[in-house]
């Protein structure tokens, strides 16, 4: 009995080690022109992701695998304005996380659970604030998940 319990524990521990060894972290850092946002420029024109500065944030796509973590954060600008990521919410396509939305205070981390392979990409809304006050802004990028992990 002790041997069976030992091997069960060993198998579980090995699974955790393998899963964490192969899971990667993907970061999506949102940068915005705060003055443009304050002048009613749409977030899709006033913001971009640091990882792909030349891509419209609506077209920004995170390529991930099952088991990977995705971290969304905002960057502080030269004037000290901070971007707080408040919510990641599923809109359409293929759900890749365990729940349809997650709220946060400044950053949000989610672990990919399901694949979009041969299915529509995960389309979601990022809701964010500037300096944690006032208006809530939104951008709608996507996640594409392969079958790995």
Where are these regions (language model features)?
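N-terminal edge beta-strand
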Residues: 25-66
